[in-house]
Structure formats: C-alpha cells, structure tokens
Regions:
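A short helix->beta-strand "capping" segment at the edge of beta-propeller domains
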Residues: 23-36, 319-322
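A short beta-strand motif characteristic of beta-propeller blades
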Residues: 25-31, 68-76, 124-131, 170-182, ...
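Beta-rich, blade/repeat-based domains predominating
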Residues: 32-49, 54, 77-101, 131-149, ...
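Conserved beta-strand positions in repeat-built beta-propeller and related beta-rich domains
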Residues: 50-55, 89, 95-110, 149-155, ...
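A short loop-to-beta-strand structural motif that recurs across blades of beta-propeller domains
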Residues: 58-60, 113-116, 158-161, 206-208, ...
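Short loop/turn segments that connect beta-strands within beta-propeller blades
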Residues: 63-67, 119-124, 163-167, 211-216, ...
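Asp-box/WD-like beta-propeller blade repeats and closely related beta-sheet repeat scaffolds
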Residues: 109-146
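Beta-propeller blade signature
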Residues: 111-121, 305-323
C-alpha cells in the first residue's frame, strides 16, 4: 500500500489580484538550480511571486519586474523543512507556509507538520504552529475575510484552523467526511469563498464544500456536484467572489475555472497541456501563473531505470485569465 508520505508528493496549495498590466509581466518565471521540486506558489500586492520548494526546504521569491526566482527564506529558518503550500495574506502582511519533515516511505515524520508565519515584506519569521493530529502533512492554506487561517492535513484528511489572534491550530473539519485516511485520498488544495471553505482530494478527484457557521464552526461537509469531472486536482485559488482557479494534474495537465454556487459547480477549461505536472496557480492582475513541480522525477522508485532525459528548468508559465 502506498504510504501517506509518498502519496502526498503526487499532490506536489493565493493572493489578491494586482493592478499590473499584462504586457509588463513575463511569460515564464524560472527557478534556477537542480532538484527544486516546487509544490506551491502565491503572490503579493507588490507584484512578487513566492514559491515553496520540497527538496531544497526553502522559499523563493520573484521580485516585481523579474522573471527569475531567488532564495528568499533559506532552509532551516526557524526550523523550516520540506516546504509545500504557501499563501500570501496581504491584509496582515503575512506569508503562511506549510512545512513537513518527510522521511522514507512508510516511516512516520520525525517532526509533525507545521504551519509557519513569515513577514510578507522582510521574510522574517513571526511564529509557527504544530498540527494538532499526529503524523500530519501540511499541504495548502487559505484565509477567510475575518483573518482565520485554514490548512489541509493530507495524511489525516482534515482541515485545521488557526483562529484570528489564536496561538494553536485546531481540527476544524474531517472525521472521515473527506474520505478515510487509510484510503489515501490526499486532501490537497483549499480556498475560501465568502462563508464557505472549498477543498479538493487529489487521488479521488473530488471537490468538497464546508459552510462556515455564524459561530465560526464547520457546517456539514458536502461533495460539490460538478457539471463534468475534474482529474487529479491540486492547488486552487479563489478568483472573484464565486469562482476558483484550479490546476489538474490528470489527463496531461490543465488549468480550469469553476463557477461555484454552494454545492454545485460549472467547470471551464482555460488551458490544457502541462506535461511536467501542474501543482499550483496564482494570479497577478489578469495573468495566472501555473507552476509545474516535476514531481514524477522526485517520486522515481529506488532501483528504477535511470532517467537519461536532460534536466528541465523549473518554471511557472503565464496564461491570461482576465478579470474575475
């Protein structure tokens, strides 16, 4: 049986739109170096694009006007490890990041999943919060209008929450509602639209919605009924008041837009053809950047034939999405 740690790497998570003209933005953002294996990207209102790396255990930033990422938050900063989801909360000047210490398949992490908070301008560490359930894997992050932070725990199939002003994470939704942990459904991408949290499962290709109650507690989890199937969904971001942009790693990879109305949704394909495995998307003005993680290379089994293909650059590519 595939281990939760090995499975999550198949998953590989937002920011406010920027008032930046599409013509001023590069077509490709490159992350120099080998074995970067990025899992998520986000963007801030100054035009920066921020990228997390699984293997290098650090966070990169593409400065406004540049097309090349530079190391911004080095590995080991305040204990930062394998970096998955990143999310820029511009309202609080905070970059949230998922950190995991991954070991060999079948071996529990030596350190439980941790949600980090960094200063969005300086990169200085603000705080970190350990996941409440053991053997957790922090995958992706979203923030609601009140400032509450939500993150997906892939291995435990839970959504955890950090209340605004809180000092500890708590389990907010789960209890088998997204699938049993033993089934390795991989709870992955997450986004907030109004008073609803949306989350997807990579391996079972499902999208779920959870109402946020007036008291902040989670309502009943429901699977979103889509007008056509999605395939291996990964990172997604809120796009306007009622839509999400979502990357799908199945069927050759694609970027889709889903118009949501509670527990129903209409899927529109924006672009197809991401052969290196799309893992995340962020929006800068009217431009979306789709990040490809090349995680199939990272997941090559021990003893498998050597890959003689020349290394490809790690990159995020632009696609016009217009205004929400």
């Amino acid at each position: 049986m595939t281990s939760p740690i090995r499975s999550v790497l198949f998953a590989s998570l937002g920011a406010l739109p920027l008032t930046v003209g599409a013509a001023s933005l590069p077509d490709t953002l490159t992350i120099p170096g080998e074995k970067i294996f990025p899992e998520s990207l986000t963007s801030s209102t100054d035009g920066s694009v921020i990228i997390g790396s699984i293997s290098q255990k650090q966070i990169y930033r593409v400065k406004p006007g540049s097309d090349t990422a530079e190391v911004w938050i080095p590995a080991g900063t305040d204990g930062l490890n394998n970096t998955f989801g990143v999310f820029a909360d511009n309202r609080t000047n905070t970059l949230y990041a998922c950190s995991n210490l991954l070991g060999p398949p079948g071996v529990a992490p030596a350190v439980n999943a941790t949600l980090y908070a960094f200063d969005l301008k300086s990169g200085a560490s603000k705080a970190h919060y350990v996941f409440p359930t053991g053997k957790g894997i922090c995958n992706d992050i979203a923030v609601d209008a009140q400032g509450n932070v939500y993150a997906t725990d892939t291995s435990n199939m839970e959504i955890v929450r950090l209340k605004k002003g809180g000092s500890a994470l708590e389990v907010w939704a789960g209890n088998g509602d997204f699938g049993k942990p033993a089934d390795h459904g991989i709870l992955d991408g997450i986004a907030v639209l109004g008073n609803r949290v949306y989350a997807n499962t990579l391996m079972t290709s499902k999208l779920f919605t959870v109402p946020i109650g007036a008291d902040g507690n989670a309502g009943a989890v429901a699977e979103v009924q889509l007008d056509h199937e999605i395939s291996r969904p990964d990172g997604m971001r809120a796009f306007g008041k009622s839509d999400v942009l979502i990357v799908e790693s199945g069927n050759g990879g694609r970027l889709s837009r889903i118009a949501l109305n509670g527990a129903t949704g209409k899927v529109t394909t924006i672009k197809e053809g991401y052969p290196d495995g799309p893992v995340s998307v962020t929006v800068v003005g009217t431009t979306a950047y789709v990040l490809e993680g090349q995680l199939a290379t990272l997941l090559r089994k021990p003893g498998a034939p050597a890959d003689t293909t020349p290394p490809k650059p790690f990159k995020a590519t632009a696609v016009q999405v217009g205004k929400p």
